[in-house]
């Protein structure tokens, strides 16, 4: 099967946004206009094409990023719909890794919201070019220029409108195209009656002003255009488009467009903008990787002629075909039935079938080419972030980093039958989602599951019930506290058991000191002159790593510390790896009195949106939860409070906010960083954990 669309005519894009900005609806309309769907499904009726897991249809939010292929004006557009709910940021992170461009959807009433900031930051990390689509222009309180302002203020992004709306709220009935200097008027809400007309007289002045600003902004990034602009020469539509494209693909400029996906206004123009301004796989830098044996850096260009290299970015369990591995092909060609090497794990894999995915239907294809996104059936050992490549030309592409879970709950199966199935369910679910962990607590024997938030874990338990038919009781959520040292000290650990027969002897002096936040545990060997033989040194490191897992104050993992083995002694006969492991863990316990250990807790960035009259109550409530208010602003006729609050104080906040505001307040929160717990709280945590 020959390549259907050239690389220049391929776009891999993500659609990203805050929850409820109308992202799934926008994707839905794109699929409708590109001829993939015959009837439009509304999210609020629970019939959307992209939201195909049962929970998504019930809750009206998108949880797993479904990858869909659509066609528009001779181009193939692969779309990944990403969830906007904060608990699912990992889904966004992994889809951004394999995209070439993205559409950020904003709500015209709210502009940039906290989750938008998180997703925007992630996209900046991966250098993803973006177009901003200001959606819901038909909504009460919709304000296009206010929304553009929030992009400047909150994201510090160089964003400029390339369109202006004609009217707003229920008067929104057209769009001015500043690039082509024309307008599109909508005769109805079905998107079937669109007329391209001259810009209406009453909007001409504003359109000229904003077109001038647009040309100036683009010219600043393009010397040739700047010269023409300064010399007063006219810049043609083609030159302006080329300038916008160049500045957008180099992530220096973000075009802003507007519309209402729900009312079918502006979606076709959004598709045109995706093709005009977002990059093809040829416009983004070639992907870099390393050779497995030498760690030498190599690159793979977007070309069918290069050796095959792809990145697995999502694993899903499908009721009909089993395990599906979604992957992005960076270079080369892959045929179904062929063998590839998983270079990350060093295993050989056979690709059984290759499927091109529509939101929840699929089409089998025999070949995938560079720049494509598809799903493979039959891969056994591949997990998220693994590289698949040609067996004769190995390469390891840069993998993805995932955040550690911040919340955990104990779960127990309701019956013996459930117990057997629960193990399978948990291992499949953790294979699909790298931010979800399941383990057995050594002391209590309970199964503990951990994730990114209450909703995340709710959905996991829900999926266990529906997909794996496992009924389970769920305990109260627990916060993932951490411990760390605030002071440095040199401490001794000595383990000696020598009473007749073969004894045990290990003796170490270790210098502990705090490490930079986020650096984790670092172990260094500073032994001189062999006072501790070389073969026992890894045992000291391993002994410390084991002991760190259970902390020193309240049994939480110790993080961000450095340990240097500086001295010690050994016994020719009685020393063993085990003895040195124990000596190292004794040194860590001895450090408690000298290294000022503290407990750290996850802090959440919280944004509460409430009617003005509840302001006092809500501020008081935030403070009573040990929160720090970091800013307030008016948004339309509502007030927005931004605060930093410990996760432990946020349990059940949704219920309390509902009752405090008669159901009129909403909030969202996202994990921000770890911070030291106040002494009084720390004492309580230690008491509770020691069962006092």
Curated annotation (Swiss-Prot):
Which InterPro entries does this UniProt record tie to the protein? EFG_II (IPR041095), EFG_III (IPR009022), EFG_III/V (IPR035647), EFG_IV (IPR047872), EFG_V (IPR035649), EFG_V-like (IPR000640), EFTu-like_2 (IPR004161), G_TR_CS (IPR031157)
Instruction: Give TM segment ranges.
Output: none
**GO terms under cellular component:** cytoplasm
GO function terms (MF aspect): GTP binding; GTPase activity; translation elongation factor activity
Q: Which UniProt keywords apply?
A: Cytoplasm, Elongation factor, GTP-binding, Nucleotide-binding, Protein biosynthesis
Which coarse location class applies to the principal site listed for this UniProt protein?
cytoplasm
Query: Where would I find the tr-type G domain in this sequence?
Result: 8-282
Does this entry carry the keyword Isomerase?
no
Q: Does the keyword Nucleotidyltransferase apply?
A: no
- Which Gene Ontology BP terms does the record give? ribosome disassembly
* Residues bound to GTP: 17-24, 81-85, 135-138
The protein's location, in the record's own words, is: Cytoplasm
Look up the domain of life of the source: Bacteria
Entries under NCBIfam families matching the protein: EF-G, PRK12740.1-3, PRK12740.1-5, PRK13351.1-1, small_GTP
What does this gene product do? Catalyzes the GTP-dependent ribosomal translocation step during translation elongation. During this step, the ribosome changes from the pre-translocational (PRE) to the post-translocational (POST) state as the newly formed A-site-bound peptidyl-tRNA and P-site-bound deacylated tRNA move to the P and E sites, respectively. Catalyzes the coordinated movement of the two tRNA molecules, the mRNA and conformational changes in the ribosome.
Q: Which family does it belong to?
A: Belongs to the TRAFAC class translation factor GTPase superfamily. Classic translation factor GTPase family. EF-G/EF-2 subfamily.
The name on file for this protein is Elongation factor G
Please give the organism.
Bacillus cereus (strain ATCC 14579 / DSM 31 / CCUG 7414 / JCM 2152 / NBRC 15305 / NCIMB 9373 / NCTC 2599 / NRRL B-3711)
Q: Which gene encodes it?
A: fusA
């Amino acid at each position: 099967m020959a390549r259907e669309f050239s690389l220049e005519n391929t776009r891999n894009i993500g659609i990203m946004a805050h929850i409820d900005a109308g992202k799934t609806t926008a994707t839905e309309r794109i699929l409708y206009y590109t001829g993939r769907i015959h009837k439009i499904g509304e999210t609020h009726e629970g019939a959307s094409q992209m939201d195909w897991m049962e929970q998504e249809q019930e809750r009206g939010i998108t949880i797993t990023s479904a990858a869909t292929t659509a066609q528009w004006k001779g181009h193939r557009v692969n779309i990944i719909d990403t969830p906007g709910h904060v608990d699912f940021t990992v889904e966004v992170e992994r889809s951004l890794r394999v995209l070439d461009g993205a559409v950020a959807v904003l709500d015209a009433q709210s502009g940039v919201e906290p989750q938008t900031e998180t997703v925007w930051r992630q996209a900046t990390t991966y250098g993803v070019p973006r177009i901003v689509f200001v959606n819901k222009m038909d909504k009460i309180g919709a304000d296009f220029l206010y929304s553009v302002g929030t992009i400047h203020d909150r994201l510090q992004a160089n964003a400029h409108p390339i369109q202006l709306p004609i009217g707003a709220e229920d008067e929104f009935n057209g769009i001015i195209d500043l690039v082509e200097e024309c307008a599109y008027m909508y005769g109805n809400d079905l998107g079937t009656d669109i007329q391209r007309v001259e810009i209406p007289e009453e909007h001409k002045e504003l359109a000229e002003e904003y077109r001038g600003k647009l040309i100036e902004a683009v010219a600043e990034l393009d010397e040739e255009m700047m010269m023409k602009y300064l010399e007063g020469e006219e810049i043609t539509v083609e030159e302006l488009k080329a300038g916008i494209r160049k500045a957008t693909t180099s992530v220096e400029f973000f075009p802003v467009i507007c519309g209402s996906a729900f009312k079918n206004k502006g979606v076709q123009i959004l598709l045109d903008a995706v093709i005009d301004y977002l990059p093809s796989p040829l416009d983004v830098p070639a992907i870099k990787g390393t050779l497995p044996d030498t760690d030498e850096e190599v690159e793979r260009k977007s070309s069918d002629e290069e050796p095959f290299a792809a990145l697995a970015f999502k694993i899903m369990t499908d009721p009909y075909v089993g395990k599906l591995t979604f992957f992005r092909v960076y270079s080369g060609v892959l045929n179904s039935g062929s063998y590839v090497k998983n270079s990350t794990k060093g295993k050989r894999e056979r690709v059984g079938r290759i499927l091109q995915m529509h939101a929840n239907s699929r089409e089998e294809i025999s070949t995938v080419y560079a720049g494509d996104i598809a799903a493979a059936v039959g891969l056994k050992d591949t997990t998220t972030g693994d590289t698949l490549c040609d067996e004769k030309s190995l390469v390891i592409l840069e993998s993805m980093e995932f955040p550690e879970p911040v919340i955990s709950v104990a779960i127990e199966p309701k019956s013996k039958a459930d117990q057997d199935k629960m193990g399978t369910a948990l291992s499949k679910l953790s294979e699909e989602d790298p931010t979800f962990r399941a383990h057995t607590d050594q002391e209590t024997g309970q199964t503990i599951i951990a994730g990114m938030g209450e909703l995340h874990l709710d959905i996991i338990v829900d999926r266990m019930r529906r997909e794996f038919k496992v009924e389970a009781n769920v305990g109260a959520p627990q916060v993932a506290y951490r411990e760390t040292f605030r002071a440095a000290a040199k401490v001794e650990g000595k383990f000696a058991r020598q009473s007749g027969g073969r004894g045990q002897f290990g003796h170490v002096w270790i210098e502990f000191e705090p490490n930079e936040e986020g650096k984790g545990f670092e172990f260094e060997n500073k032994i001189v002159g062999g006072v501790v033989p070389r073969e026992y040194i890894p045992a000291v490191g391993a002994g410390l790593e084991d002991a760190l897992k259970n902390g020193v104050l309240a049994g939480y993992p110790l993080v961000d510390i450095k340990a240097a083995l500086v001295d010690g002694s050994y016994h020719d006969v009685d020393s063993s790896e085990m003895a040195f492991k124990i000596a190292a863990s004794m040194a860590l316990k001895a450090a408690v009195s000298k290294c000022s250990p503290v407990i750290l807790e996850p802090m959440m960035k919280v944004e509460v949106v409430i009617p003005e009259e509840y302001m006092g109550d809500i501020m008081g409530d935030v403070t009573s939860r040990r929160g720090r208010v970091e800013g307030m602003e008016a948004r339309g006729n509502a007030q927005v409070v931004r605060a930093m609050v410990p996760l432990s104080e946020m349990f059940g906040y949704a219920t309390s906010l509902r009752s405090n505001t008669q159901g009129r307040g909403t909030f969202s929160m996202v994990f921000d960083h770890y911070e030291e717990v106040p002494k009084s709280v720390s004492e309580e945590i230690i008491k509770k954990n020691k069962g006092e």
